[in-house]
Every structure is written in C-alpha cells, then in structure tokens.
Amino acid sequence: MPRLVNGREAAPTYSNLVGFIFIFNLIVGTGALTLPGVFARAGWMLSLIVIVLLAIISYMTVTFIIEAMACANAIRNWQTLQALRQSRSSAENSENDDNADDVSLASGAEQVGDFERVPLTIQNREFHYYQLSHKFELGEMATLFFNEFGRVMFYLCLIVYLYGDLSIYSAAVARSLRDVVCDQTNGTDTNNLMYWPGDFENNTSLACWKEHTISRLNMYRVLLIGFTLIFGPFVYFNVQKTKYLQMLTAAFRWMAFTLMICISLKLLISRGAKGHPATFNVYGIPSLFGACVYSFMCHHSLPSLLAPIRHKSMVSKILSIDYIIICAFYILLAMTGIFAFERIEDLYTLDFLPYDVAYVDFWSGLLICIDYFLALFPIFTLSTSFPIVAITLKNNLQSLFLDMSQYESYSVILRLCFPLLAIIPPFCITYFTESLSSLVAFTGTYAGTGIQYIIPVFLVYFARRTCSELLGSGVVNRFKSPFKSSAWLVFVFIWSILCVCLVSINLFS
C-alpha cells in the first residue's frame, strides 16, 4: 500500500515554447564547458559515438521519470477517490442523526469541491487517473514507491551528486579567477592543461606573478577561501533563484556559448586547424563518460518543470527535440574547439584568455573585452547557482537524518550544523585538488549514473507494479514511456553497471 499523498494546489502554467526553453537551460550548464577538453583527450570519433549513445540513454531514462510521475499522480487521484467514497458512505450512515439534513448539505458541498479538484469519473477514468498536473519531486516519488532502504539509498546518491556539484562550482570559480588574476603567460604552461593531469603539483612551483613569490596553487587556495566565505553563509538563508536572475543568467550563458563557437569557427577559417586530436584514445574514457553524463543531467529537477507545461501531451515531443538540439550543440561546441586550439583547458572558457594581445585600436580592445567576458563567465553563473545548490544539499541532509515533522524540537546547535555539513566537505575537496576533469569524472560516473540511470529504472519499475496492483491493467497510462518493455529496464541497469566498472578500472589502474 503506497503512502498517502497530500493534496496541493496546481502550479501556474506556461506554454510549450517556454517549457522547451526552461528544460534546455536546465540541461545545458557547467558540464558543457568541460566537453571540449574531454573530447580532445578521448579522441573525436570515440567522443562522437559516446555522446550520441549517452544522449539516447539519458532521454530513455527521462521518459521513465515522466511515467513514474504520472503514476504518482494516478495514485494520488486513486487515494482521493477512495477518501471521497468513504466520506459519502459516512454521510449516508449519519442520515438518522438529529442534524441529518445539515450534515448532508455540508458533506455534499465538500464532495463537490473535492470532485472539482479531482476531475475523475468512471466514464473517463483512463484519461484522468494518469496526469502530470501535480509536481512530484524525485524525493517524493522515492518515498512513495521505495521502502526505507531504497529511500535512504536515493538520498545518499543525491547528496553525493550535490557534493560533487558544489565541488565543481568552487573549483571552476577559483580556477577562473586565478587564471585571470595571475600572469597569463603562466596560464598557457603545458603542465596546467588537460593533457597533463599533474597540474596540481606543477602549480605549486609556478609563480602567479614574475615579481612575486606566491604560487599559482596558493593563489587558487586564497581565492577559494574568499569565494567560500562570501557565498557560503547564504546557505543559512532561504535564497531562491528568481525568474529575472534566471533570465539574466540564461542570456549570459547563450551569449558566451555563441561567442565561443563563433570565435572558434573564425579561427578555423582564418588560420586552419591548430588542434590535431586523436581518433580513439581509451584512456580518456573515464573523463569522457563522466562529463557526458554530467552534461545531460536534468532528472533531479525535471518534475518541477513538467508540471506547469500547459499541453502535457506534448511533453515527450518537447524533450525529444531538446535532446536532439542539445546533443548537436554539444558536438558543435566541442568539435570546433578541439580543432581550433592546439591545447584545451579542462574549463573551455580559459582558452579564451587574451594571451599576448595588445590594445592598439577599438577592435583589438573589443576582442580583449570579449575574451575577459568569456573567462569570467563561469564566475557569475556559478556564483549565483552555488547558494541554491548548497541550500538544496542542506535540505536533503536534513530530510535524511532528521524527522522534518519535528524539526523545531531539535536544538539550535544541531540545526546549525547542517549548513556547515553542506559547505565544508566541498571546500576540503577543492582545497586539495583543482582538477575539474577528475571532479566531473567522479561526480558524473558514480553519483550521476545513480541519478540518471539506476534511480529512474527502479522508480518506473515499482511505479508500474504499484499502479497495476491498485488500478489494474485496464487503465492506460498515456504518459507511458515508449521504452515500455522490461527488457529496456534490464538493459539500462546492466549498461550502467558495466560502464561504472569499466570507468573505475581505467580511472584507478
């Protein structure tokens, strides 16, 4: 018997185009900036094959999330209908009371209101049981369909992913600031690039400025401490990414991506290919797999974007178009970069720093401004996202370890510990490593595989089984995944396990 789902008001709706844009912006993020580097390391042909294959499998598991969410709505509607039937039965049994007329009128009014909120009829039950009108987050679906062990494993997987997310954000901001502040000639040192993963050790001896003794590593750590001290305290407050901030961030993001692609194409046309990446390089698979999984990650936030879409029947089509365009965009961004530049930084924006460029006229000055905008672009976007992700992590830690229904009964000291638990581990990780490729590889391969592959498989499996027991097989789920055979579930599960094993062997051998 599933847990009772509380009713909630429906969210405001938006058009299919707005939903398309929101989902597009959700998927395309920091991971895209790491793709050129991993493409260069793994080889262009191998990278093409892997990213297309992972895009298809990621879309497959997204359809599992949609189906599971529709099943959660069906269970909610079923529970509400049972409650209405019990209410009607109780009203009929109370007809012999002294206030039978008043009770019947009040009960009838309540039933009318409940039926208005749940448009469920016997004649049209196949259409109304399965909906996407009410938002069910992954945590709610895990609580609904999983047992206690499954719920704990879900939260652990999500928490590890969010820790990785914060570590990537911190390292990306600190590295971007360091490479902008320090002498740019040192920024091109081959020991600090994707091809040489030992950059952390070399930055210990490389000076940030020729006339000073502070090393690039120490400058990175100073900037990391400053970033954490400035944005870390926001985790104690209820900070939200407003619509206007989201629109501004999206505008900056697309301006930056467009400029990067245009500059790379211009360099390819004007001076030819400077980069000569390999065709296949199996040693680049760990970073490639992790970055691709990380770049297609949207599953943990997708339900909140699906519920407000006005025409729910178009959800699958919107997502399929999103995935096709995003995959093509990733390939264009990475392929132009690996052939336009001789060497690729693991954060692609750092390849656009104005090395040895002098200001001589308006156009050279404009080019320098564009280069600095691209180099500083991750700092703005990730700084605005850092507090939101940290607050999400804090809330999930509290949900895992505390009884949120009795939250106010816990001591203030205990409640103040959770924001620190959200901030300190990512800081410690990035203090001792600045390798974005390693952070992305680990986060995408392990926690990302759990959230993007394994959790959707188990969610849709238990959702199908629960709905079959409650509603029977005669009620059709119009949001059912096109990959409805159980063989697809087995395939995705085996695929994810094999990938994690192979990546682990390559990563630690």
Swiss-Prot record:
The chain crosses the membrane at residues 20-40, 46-66, 152-172, 219-239, 249-269, 278-298, 321-341, 362-382, 412-432, 440-460, 488-508. It is found in: Membrane. Residues 41-45, 173-218, 270-277, 342-361, 433-439, 509 are extracellular. It is a multi-pass membrane protein. Residues 1-19, 67-151, 240-248, 299-320, 383-411, 461-487 are cytoplasmic. Keywords: Glycoprotein, Membrane, Transmembrane, Transmembrane helix. GO terms for cellular component: membrane. Pfam families: Aa_trans. Glycans are attached at N186, N202, N203. InterPro entries: AA_transpt_TM. Belongs to the TMEM104 family. This is Transmembrane protein 104 homolog. It comes from Drosophila melanogaster (Fruit fly). The lineage of its organism: Eukaryota, Metazoa, Ecdysozoa, Arthropoda, Hexapoda.
